[in-house]
Regions:
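Extended beta-solenoid/beta-helix repeat architectures
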Residues: 6-112
Length: 112
């Protein structure tokens, strides 16, 4: 299952087709195009907040990552607050906490 839920405007949505529709209408095409499982997502102030799940592949454009596994893909920008960054390319962003695997290709990282 791709999504567990999406919370937007205080409303929880669990229907995958409805979630895709909401993400597209809010300009988050990159999230719809990515491959992941069991995603727990919230949108607040036009920002994606990834609460949990497994990111399999795709390009993370921006947002706040709170928990879960980033298994492969490209991280363009955002704040990584916790979880596991296992593989892929880190272009830019802030790494606050969690595990950054040694085989991740890192271009620019700010640790806070």
């Amino acid at each position: 299952m791709k999504y567990r839920y999406l919370i937007i405007g205080g409303k929880e949505i669990i229907n995958p087709k409805e979630i895709d529709k909401v993400l597209i209408s809010n300009g988050f095409y990159w999230l719809v195009d990515a491959e992941f499982e069991e995603a727990e997502i919230e949108i607040e102030n036009n920002t994606v907040i990834w609460k949990g799940g497994i990111w399999l592949y795709g390009t993370w454009n921006y947002g706040i990552w709170q928990n879960g596994e980033f298994r492969s893909g490209k991280w363009l920008n955002g704040i990584f607050e916790g979880g596991e960054f296992l593989n892929g390319t880190w272009e830019s962003g802030i790494f606050k906490d969690g595990n950054l695997n040694d085989n991740v290709k890192v271009n620019v990282i700010n640790k806070k």
